[in-house]
Amino acid sequence: MNFVIATRRSKLAQVQTEIIIDLLNKKHDIECEKLLIETVGDKILEVSLDKIGGKGLFVKDIEVAMLEQRADAAVHSMKDVPYEMPKGFEIIAIPEREDVRDAFISLDNIKFKDLRKGAKIGTSSRRRAAQLKLLRPDLDIVPIRGNVQTRIEKIKKENLDGIILAVAGLKRVNLDHLITDYFDTKEMVPAIGQGALGIEVMEEHPKKELFKDLDHYNSKICVLAERAFMRELDGDCHSTIGAYASIKDNIMHIIGIFERKNKIIKKEITGTKDQYEKLGIALAEHILKD
């Protein structure tokens, strides 16, 4: 059996797809090949995502490949997948999640707490920028886009003191040795779905059940809880929003942030994990009452 899996052209996207292919090979005797697609989001790098249509730009061209039957499935970073799926598509599986934290990288190995006053920090994320300003109001936030390697190179090129990147991506491309500091998930609440990969298929695909074996239940319901929080707040790349759900002894804890009326609101909620979607919605409602 031959499967074609669509993904973006970046090194990270290809590595993430190879992770899924390896998992498939362990579960089933399946031959897989990658279909590399340059998405609109990959082509336009000089403009921030919220000005050109959001993170869905990394997904739409790949969905077209599935519609045209050039691909059987797609692998995405779940943080790039809009909460509203197009008709006829679904996320069939979310494998075990990687480290959800954000990392600080400084080429001179200067710790975040030791940064000079007015230090220039590169990030294109509204969520990261807002939380950086809460931690250090004096910081100068510089927008940067591009793949992981490009952003790291921009530290020198743009004379930055450091940048913020997701730990998961750095680990997957074997660059986590560059990390200077790890942010705790309470001081820097991650993006919705950060660290998780999602396998997208068309609902009518005859072999879609093969992917279900790759699902990691706790990882999936944590991401779904975060996405319920985002959906209730109608969050997207125009929003300053983040959430992280974790499970211990069947109890789910979610921390979320959202910018409302020019104020960053942070709330937490705890409940049984079988109520994951209701917990995400309830957390959003708490924030809206603030």
UniProtKB/Swiss-Prot annotation:
A GO cellular-component term linked to this record: cytoplasm
Domain of life: Bacteria
S-(dipyrrolylmethanemethyl)cysteine PTM sites in chain numbering: 237
Keyword line: Porphyrin biosynthesis, Transferase
Subunit structure: Monomer.
Pathway in which the depicted protein is active: Porphyrin-containing compound metabolism; protoporphyrin-IX biosynthesis; coproporphyrinogen-III from 5-aminolevulinate: step 2/4
Cofactor: binding comment: Binds 1 dipyrromethane group covalently.
One annotated GO biological process: protoporphyrinogen IX biosynthetic process
Additional detail: The porphobilinogen subunits are added to the dipyrromethane group.
GO molecular-function terms, A-Z: hydroxymethylbilane synthase activity
Organism: Clostridium botulinum (strain Okra / Type B1)
InterPro entries from the UniProt entry: HemC, Porphobilin_deaminase_N, Porphobilinogen_deaminase_C, Porphobilinogen_deaminase_C_sf
Catalytically driven reaction(s): 4 porphobilinogen + H2O = hydroxymethylbilane + 4 NH4(+)
Function: Tetrapolymerization of the monopyrrole PBG into the hydroxymethylbilane pre-uroporphyrinogen in several discrete steps.
E.C. code: 2.5.1.61
Recorded family membership: Belongs to the HMBS family.
Lineage: Bacteria, Bacillati, Bacillota, Clostridia, Eubacteriales
NCBIfam families for this protein: hemC
Cofactor requirement: dipyrromethane
Protein's name according to its UniProt entry: Porphobilinogen deaminase
